[in-house]
Amino acid sequence: TKEFKQVVTVNNVSLEVKQGEIFGLVGPDGAGKTTMIRMLTGIMDVTSGSINILGAADSEQVKSRFGYVPQKFSLYGDLTVMENIRVIGSLYGESKENIAALASEILGFTNLLPFKDRLADNLSGGMKQKLALAAGLMHKPEIYFLDEPTTGVDPVSRREFWQMLYKLNKEGTTIFVSTPYMDEAEFCTRVAFMHNGVITTCDSPQVLRKKYPYKIIEL
């Protein structure tokens, strides 16, 4: 639970995310998704309750084992793509040799290698999100938290971004992603729907479809 001046933004939420799955937190703006992820990553303290990540009750203890992409682009706009990657690599304590090897590998994975000398400020919205994803991969996280990574991104870039998430997941990375888009719920192993700080339902997309008592029409 999280309260701000007697306003409850996350209300008695209980979740278990299984290793190796893509877990989606779906809900409209103001549902509490960002607050939830900030609590999970240790950026924000809980008002009551506890969080356990990778066997640790304190996320600080396992900070080096998970990655986080915030909703707002937070890298350096006046640095190039490669310079941003090198800075993040050095913050994680990687050697220059490791940074050089990892940077080429990760920029290749995210299709950003041809743009390695472009300033981050000059990237499109979709490419900025790819850069944020790449930066978070510099320490090979076991769990990756992504807060609405495709919001405001064009449909083609959204599809490419999800393809990269699938590749990461196949390599063993657990993905926890929030989104306001209902169609992205279909891409997840399991989905939790959040509204006004409360989890209303949680299950696989297939089971949730079967439980829905009305006809579903896709346009």
Where are the predicted features?
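Catalytic Walker B motif of ABC-type/P-loop ATPase nucleotide-binding domains
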Residues: 144-147
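Conserved ABC ATPase "signature" region
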Residues: 86, 90, 97-115
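Conserved ABC transporter NBD signature motif
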Residues: 48-62
